[in-house]
Amino acid sequence: MAIQISLTAEIIELNEQISYIKASKNPLSSDVVFIKRKDCIWVYDVGACKETAHEIEQIFKKKKVVLSHFHPDHVWNLICTTRSELYVSETTRKYVKQGTIVKDEIIEPANGKYPELRVFNFPSCHAKGCLALQCGEYVFLGDATYSQEKGSKHIYNEQILKQMIDCIEQLDCEFIGLSHSRGFIHKKEDVLTLLKSIYGFREKGRSEISFDNFFYNDEIMEKEFEEDEEESDE
């Protein structure tokens, strides 16, 4: 008897226009965001699992894809999905060998019920060449707020971390999507609180802030965002 394998992924709606597929650990695959527009669908990251690739291929409207950065869990499904347009950073372009490089901010004006959409470069310690996407009150940052990993150490460059904090403070949004984080969507102020707490550990004369399993520790993530989780469950 043939065994049928379902390739259906759970799609979570944030509002009438924005939805996403959760990240997975096995295989490691990023959260993937879908944003409906009048004449197209924007897709933020394409993930690395078959279920996500299947859902992307179920979109028959024009697809505009933005890659947050070059890591495989965010870009792997490029090889098995189609798209009308692909937007990447200069660094990501070197790895995926395709796409339009985003040097200046891309702005798609508001149109009726569809809010303004922006794609822009965002500073990051985790990976060079990160792109962010904003639609209305939501900003999606991929892994941009995470640290660089060196063995068991998680390291932030002090100067880049300060740039990250400044950029987030200037964002006109209420929520931020952080790929792989518990719950995915967090209040802007909670993300700022966490990053500022990390910045508070800087030491005079040192350009790096280093932790053993800090930002990726589930207990830390749960502690920082437990209020968000409780409110969303009510």
Place the predicted regions along the sequence by residue:
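A broadly tuned preference for mixed-charge, low-complexity surface segments
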Residues: 85-101, 116-121, 171-194
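Active-site environment of divalent metal-dependent phosphoester hydrolases
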Residues: 28-29, 49-51, 70-76, 93-96, ...
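Catalytic core of the metallo-beta-lactamase
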Residues: 3-59, 101-167
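Glycine-rich, phosphate-binding/catalytic loops in enzymes
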Residues: 59-60, 81-84, 156-158, 193-196
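Active-site neighborhood of phospho(di)ester-bond hydrolases with catalytic His/Asp-centered motifs
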Residues: 43-47, 62-73, 77, 86-90, ...
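Divalent-metal (often Zn2+) His-rich catalytic cores of metallo-beta-lactamase-fold enzymes
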Residues: 160-230
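Zn-dependent metallo-beta-lactamase
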Residues: 1-40, 172, 188-194, 214-234
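Active-site HxH/HxHxD metal-binding segment of metal-dependent hydrolases
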Residues: 48-113
